[in-house]
């Protein structure tokens, strides 16, 4: 027996060592994996997909597990339940959660888009469109309480219209069915995201006549949120994530729409190149893509004002309570 132990001793030691290495490797892999849930899969988030396709996250040693949350409520639920490390969603979601005084503090630490991403689609081309033309019309709109709808109502008020009084806003259609509903005859106008708006225009069934993003100003429209506890436990992961994102943002800011479209084509296999380029170009022209992850206080306050005017601000949450600029500041400074 002793002889057998001596005979297999070296092999047993090597096996134990190999298992130890495997365990360490597995632990390291798990530590560097980030479960990211996006509120929807959209061309509006091009810098994120560029960061993935160009390998910027991998350069930071991060393995991104990307999931479509299919809506703001579901996306926030995955974060609060611990099924996501980071979520990409409207900043208003963090305000709603914080205002409810839950035991789980949520912070916004990086910004991806800085304008609304919807467009006004008409049934007929209107070369000299004015927002006042919506008076007395039926607008196929977005759901109540979401940023797209609040921005729509803000733009209407700025242009002398009273939402729901001067403009009949239709809000009983699910987000995913808005494009089809408009094509089928619902509404005189529709507020639509890309690429739905451009596809309808390409088919000659509608015409983009105005941009809600262009006429509502800059605000932290879509941001990355995480639990404050997760940020404290994984500051290195948060900083590396933000650094990779910043690389993607800078790449999009310095490359033409054609190259951006080519870089993210694999993420949108069902969208033609022509539509991809057109959509990216529109978003670049109106500066929808934030060039840095830094969430500015002035833009955050603009968001609060839009929510307040819409009657959807449950509580005014101070900038410093909701926004963590530590990691964005560091990566922009090159740290």
Regions found by a protein language model. Give the residues of each.
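Bacterial N-terminal signal peptides that target proteins for export
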Residues: 2-13
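C-terminal motif of bacterial Sec signal peptides marking the signal peptidase cleavage site
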Residues: 21-23
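Bacterial lipoprotein signal-peptidase II cleavage site
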Residues: 25-32
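Short, glycine-/small- and polar/acidic-enriched structural segments
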Residues: 32-164, 168-172, 181, 188-194, ...
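Soluble non-cytosolic domains of exported or imported proteins
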Residues: 69-73, 88, 142, 146-147, ...
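Pocket-lining segment of extracytoplasmic ligand-binding domains
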Residues: 93, 124, 165, 174-268
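Secondary-structure end/capping motifs
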Residues: 232-314
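Conserved C-terminal helix/tail region of periplasmic/extracytoplasmic solute-binding proteins
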Residues: 303-335
